């Protein structure tokens, strides 16, 4: 998952915040939110590619919107949402020296060593040339995905079940990433045995079961009850098309996945007559699973914050991610609506 790269950043953010006497909750909570909001602006995310497929000309919606059209709206709107959430986070909570609970905690020498110990720096560290090679190989794979997504003519064409069309972008992403991974493994002196011990790999394996399993189950449920859902929501969405964003937000929380929510709800929106431009504008509404802190990146964020300032509240819903998430999504959807009115 594209958002899971944040696991490598959490320990760094926590250490720097503590060294600078900054309340770790301020940067860490919004970092977790930002990692998921960026999925809507990533050319290699399944959510964006799913939207490209749904809005393709073959779905009979008139004008087709491609990858670049979506990114032209999604990148500035998502970035603005993240910036607004970050600005709000600058002053959230008490400073560490004024936080009675934190000060009481560090009076225990063992707790103080646990919270402030273990900080390491990579400054003045010389990395092997293979580290730079692997970075550029990864960027090259992303560039290839963007290029293939921008121009269908570059993709091979296949005929499946008497229907001819270019290779799916879902498959293109998988192929490019697997090729890049194979090249890095062979050329950059990676020790295969150490891959399974990495934090990102472990988090990805957890995500496969905790996210993919839930998404698959919920997708099965929604597909079975789609006629009832369409009938129930049709009148609301047709009367007020903007309520599509609320429906998408709710379903996203239920399925814990942006891609699964879009796959289930975006085609329904088109079938109900929602304008394709609105689907692009409200793409950030597919990130609704911050409402309850059950997503792996949120749980990891809480675990990496040794100070305990990033947490789940007594009433569950009053957790560290709820307000940054709401600010980010509402801002992104609002700006997305304005940009689609101007640019598309």
Identify what each model region corresponds to.
Residues 1-5, 30-43, 74-82, 215-218, ...:
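Helix-loop-helix module between adjacent transmembrane segments
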Residues 239-261:
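Transmembrane alpha-helices that form the ion-translocation and gating core
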Residues 4-5, 55, 59, 92-100, ...:
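Membrane-interfacial segments
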Residues 19-27, 200-204, 231-246, 270-279:
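Membrane-interfacial loop-to-helix junctions in multi-pass transporters
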Residues 91, 100-222, 323-344:
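Hydrophobic transmembrane alpha-helices of multi-pass small-molecule transporters
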Residues 1-62, 258-290, 340-342:
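Hydrophobic transmembrane alpha-helices that form the pore/transport pathway of multi-pass ion
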Residues 3-4, 171-179, 232-240, 287-291:
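Structural signature of hydrophobic alpha-helical transmembrane segments
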Residues 40, 51, 62-127, 288-344:
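Juxtamembrane and boundary regions of transmembrane helices in multi-pass small-molecule transporters
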């Amino acid at each position: 998952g594209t958002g899971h790269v944040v696991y490598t950043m959490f320990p760094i953010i926590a250490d720097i915040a503590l060294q600078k006497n900054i309340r770790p909750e301020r940067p860490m909570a919004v970092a977790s939110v930002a990692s998921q909001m960026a999925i809507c602006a990533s050319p290699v995310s399944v959510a964006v590619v799913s939207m490209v497929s749904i809005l393709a000309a073959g779905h009979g919606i008139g004008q087709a919107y491609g990858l670049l059209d979506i990114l032209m709206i999604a990148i500035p709107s998502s970035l603005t949402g993240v910036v607004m959430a970050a600005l709000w986070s600058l002053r959230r909570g008490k400073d560490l020296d004024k936080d009675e609970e934190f000060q009481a905690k560090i009076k225990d020498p063992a707790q103080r060593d646990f919270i402030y110990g273990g900080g390491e720096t990579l400054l003045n560290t010389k990395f092997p040339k293979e580290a730079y090679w692997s970075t550029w190989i990864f960027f090259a794979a992303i560039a290839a995905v963007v290029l293939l997504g921008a121009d269908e003519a570059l993709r091979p064409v296949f005929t499946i079940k008497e229907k001819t069309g270019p290779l799916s972008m879902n498959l293109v992403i998988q192929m490019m990433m697997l090729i890049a991974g194979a090249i890095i493994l062979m050329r950059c002196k990676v020790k295969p045995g150490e891959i399974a011990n990495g934090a990102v790999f472990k988090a990805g394996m957890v995500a496969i079961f905790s996210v993919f399993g839930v998404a698959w189950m919920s997708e099965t449920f929604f597909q079975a009850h789609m006629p009832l859902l369409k009938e129930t929501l049709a009148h609301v969405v047709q009367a007020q098309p903007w309520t599509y964003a609320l429906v998408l937000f709710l379903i996203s929380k239920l399925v814990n996945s942006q891609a699964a929510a879009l796959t289930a709800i975006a085609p329904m929106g088109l079938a109900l007559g929602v304008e394709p431009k609105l689907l692009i504008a409200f793409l950030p509404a597919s990130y609704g699973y911050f409402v309850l802190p059950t997503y792996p990146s949120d749980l990891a964020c809480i675990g990496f914050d040794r100070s305990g300032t990033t947490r789940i509240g007594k009433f569950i819903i009053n957790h560290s991610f709820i307000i940054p998430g709401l600010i980010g999504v509402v801002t992104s959807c609002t700006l997305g609506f304005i940009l689609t009115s101007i640019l598309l």
